[in-house]
């Protein structure tokens, strides 16, 4: 299977540079079961498109100010992106991406406006293992001072005060992500209330978003691509909600590709098992979806693991045709863009 089969032309002007207000004012393309044409709705219409007994599954990870700009002991400039907490939550040990004018060496101490990081290991390809000089609430405060919101590079502006709130879901709880689970950015409290009144239930899992989600695929052979691991957790309460939804015949509606990957990774012996884990699952066409019946997702980059996942879920030809229609109709793409609802039943 070739990466070049997952390409499409996207005018630069359709890449959303800022969020809409309110959050649920974004557009929603709907791909229902069968071969019919996509429907074009607003995201605020979501309660009408789901049924009583369905279960929405959110990713409750919280984006941290993970981009750090500082100096090495020599005075040279260095940039670090905290990608994966190795101890869970805001611990001291992290996997990070780094760049500097000269190589970053093992044992180096990097300073970021009062926060220090010691390089414990050089993994190669720009990845490092580092130990920070604080953890927990002290680390959260230090990142608030020294860190920046890690907006994706296709947002061609500096982060501002609005991004601190808008590049975060309203239910974000567990700090640790270097990117937002963007399908969740469309939800508002009034929309959640309307979904609940409709009889749609909700629960949350946690996957800390890192390079496994946002790094590009190198080369054209999909079978040769290896995902970077990302840590996830399914609570016993979430596992029970998922089992109950199955028992009553409700659909499992994953909000975002990270929720899809969490649920599919945690599938054991006919159910989603509770507990922590680390996933390197690369979902591509041919994957046997077991845990998910529907998904909400944004419009993704050409030639990305995220687009490949959506094609696996909704059918490659149908999804790519829908993307071409989205371009023709002026849908907004990527993190701050519009959304798609894909239903398998």
Swiss-Prot record:
Its main location: cytoplasm. Pathway: tRNA modification; tRNA-queuosine biosynthesis. One of its GO terms (cellular component) is cytoplasm. It is found in: Cytoplasm. Keywords: Cytoplasm, Queuosine biosynthesis, S-adenosyl-L-methionine, Transferase. Signal peptide: none annotated. Its EC number is 2.4.99.17. InterPro entries: QueA, QueA_dom1, QueA_dom2, QueA_sf. One of its GO terms (molecular function) is S-adenosylmethionine:tRNA ribosyltransferase-isomerase activity. It catalyses: 7-aminomethyl-7-carbaguanosine(34) in tRNA + S-adenosyl-L-methionine = epoxyqueuosine(34) in tRNA + adenine + L-methionine + 2 H(+). One of its GO terms (biological process) is tRNA wobble guanine modification. Monomer. Transfers and isomerizes the ribose moiety from AdoMet to the 7-aminomethyl group of 7-deazaguanine (preQ1-tRNA) to give epoxyqueuosine (oQ-tRNA). Belongs to the QueA family. This is S-adenosylmethionine:tRNA ribosyltransferase-isomerase. It comes from Anaeromyxobacter dehalogenans (strain 2CP-C).
């Amino acid at each position: 299977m070739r990466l070049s089969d997952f390409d499409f032309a996207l005018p630069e002007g359709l890449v959303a540079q800022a969020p809409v207000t309110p959050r649920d004012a974004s557009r929603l393309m709907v791909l229902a079961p069968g071969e019919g044409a996509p429907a074009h709705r607003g995201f605020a219409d979501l309660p009408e498109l789901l049924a009583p007994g369905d279960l929405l599954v959110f990713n409750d990870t919280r984006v941290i100010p993970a981009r750090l700009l500082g100096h090495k002991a020599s005075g040279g400039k260095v940039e670090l992106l905290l990608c994966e907490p190795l101890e869970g939550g805001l611990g001291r040990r992290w996997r990070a991406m780094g760049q500097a004018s000269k190589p970053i060496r093992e044992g180096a101490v990097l300073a970021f406006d009062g926060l220090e990081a010691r390089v414990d290991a050089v993994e190669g390809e720009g990845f490092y293992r580092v130990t920070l000089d604080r953890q927990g609430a002290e680390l959260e405060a230090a990142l608030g001072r020294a860190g920046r919101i890690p907006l994706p590079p296709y947002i061609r502006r500096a982060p501002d005060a609005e991004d601190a709130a808008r590049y975060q879901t309203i239910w974000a709880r567990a700090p640790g992500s270097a990117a937002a689970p963007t399908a969740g950015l469309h939800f508002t409290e009034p929309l959640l209330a309307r979904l609940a009144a409709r009889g749609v239930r909700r629960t949350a899992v946690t996957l800390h978003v890192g390079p496994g989600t946002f790094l590009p695929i190198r080369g054209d052979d999909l079978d040769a691509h290896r995902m970077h691991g990302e840590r996830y957790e399914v609570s016993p309460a979430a596992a029970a909600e998922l089992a109950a939804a199955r028992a009553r015949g409700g659909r499992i509606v994953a909000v975002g590709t990270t929720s899809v990957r969490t649920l599919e990774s945690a599938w054991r012996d006919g159910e989603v098992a509770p507990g922590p884990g680390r996933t390197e699952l690369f979902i591509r066409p041919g994957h046997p979806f077991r845990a998910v019946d529907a998904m909400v997702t944004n419009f993704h980059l050409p030639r990305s693991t995220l687009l490949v996942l959506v094609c696996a879920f909704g059918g490659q030809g149908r999804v790519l045709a829908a993307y071409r229609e989205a371009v023709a109709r002026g849908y907004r793409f990527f993190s701050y863009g519009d959304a798609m609802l894909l239903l398998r039943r």
